[in-house]
Amino acid sequence: MPGVVIVGGGISGLSTAYYLARGGVPSTILESRPRLGGVILTERVEGCTIEAGPDSFLSAKPAAFDLIRELGLADQVIGSNDRDRVTYVRKGGRLVPLPDGLMMMVPTRILPLLTTGLLGWRTKLRMGMELLRAPRPKPGDESVAEFIQEHYGAEAVDYLAEPLLSGIYGGNPTQLSVTSVLPRFVELANQYGSLTRGVLAARAKAGRDRHSAPLFRTLQGGLGQLVEAIAGAIGGKVEVRPCRAQTIQRAEAGFRIKLDDGGWLEADQVVVACEAHSGSALLGGVDGRLAELLGTVPYSSSMTVALGFDAADFTGPGGTPPHGFGFLVPKKERRRLVACTWVGAKFPHRVPEGKVVARCFLGGMEDAGVLDESDEAVAALVASELQDIAGFTARPRFTRISRWPRAMAQYTVGHPQRLAEMQAHTPPTGGLHLAGNAYEGIGIPDCIRMGRQAAERILGIMRPSSV
């Protein structure tokens, strides 16, 4: 009988299996897709490294780099080209750079704020006056939009918070929980009153050495390299079953899992590392309230469209893509394109000389229907909007479209309270564990951390006495 069954072979499930194997506990992964890695998928097209899902991870969160180092891939880690780290926002038909010194939507430098064309004078004045704001701690949760509007006004929500968070979460700031999405900002506001003063104070305490690290990191061969390394490290210690779990039931000693191939598995410990809505469908017979809570987590759908061009054919302003990492498109601009990254500017090694790759994003909570459109319709839509927004008409040499239905969890207002109740229903000694992007962070480091924590809880119970 397998001691541990892990439902889901994405980065959360793989991390759980890796740390269990390192501690001497075998496990079985159930994965319905024909590959491991979940939304992490790297392709090589005409010499270009194309990420169908996430392209990097935040340097500030250590769990990903810690795992990469353990796997012997530290020499494969590269940082983003922060020298060109400028992001543009479309406003009134133009691409306007985000002002220098912006920490998400918090200004930290006066001159760039005064001279930016992205915000009007009323917003600039309000941002300046925000420095005088006194602490006003609030009980309970509120939306990101309410929080940012109270500090900086509605325009800051429309042209900073909304496009930035749409690019990260595919979500709506009027629905997202500020306590879950921007917890550090809530702490700083409670302590200092002014977000700007709080960010500046936190930066001063951290010291200058932290600024030397690039904002984003990735692997030379793409993030698929991480999936391959984990799979190689656990080979022989972990069984991967290419099937779908249909239901989980309590058994006399642990759990029974019914599989879609007609078989059953028994386990002492189960890690639900799939999407929360899939977990909800599995757990109704184990814990009805937990299943109900998991079912309340909304998910956004997204699509990435990678377009490859010959640089000689590129007819944008000045014959090259706009300087910087890419651009964001606020909902107020009434376009379907959410964002676009110039891959070669962010990670130069991923695009050979003479090539240009645009990685475009569509979907989100406001436009999930775009995933149902044909590849031809999507390609035409992206080409039309790139021409309108970035001003070029070059025909792509290749197009790669990736659809991710219901893949990104949304931490809506009240998420901290719901999460606390989920955790109460999954105590460390209860045999049932949750991991994934639906709980305490959506990024790769967050998922790795939660997988490691699930493994540590299990190892505390099942670790062989000889280890």
Task: Walk through the language-model features, giving the residues of each.
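Mid-domain catalytic core of redox enzymes
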Residues: 23, 243-358, 362-372, 376, ...
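Dinucleotide-binding Rossmann-like beta1-alpha1 core, especially the glycine-rich loop
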Residues: 46-135
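Conserved Rossmann-like nucleotide-cofactor binding loop
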Residues: 12, 35, 277
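Conserved flavin/dinucleotide-binding core of flavoenzymes
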Residues: 99-101, 320-323, 336-467
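N-terminal Rossmann-like FAD-binding beta1-loop-alpha1 element of flavoenzymes
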Residues: 2-29, 459
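Short loop/edge segments at beta-strand edges and connector loops
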Residues: 8, 81, 241-244, 249, ...
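Active-site/ligand-binding neighborhood in enzyme catalytic cores
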Residues: 86, 106, 110, 123-248, ...
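Glycine-rich FAD pyrophosphate-binding loop
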Residues: 21-45
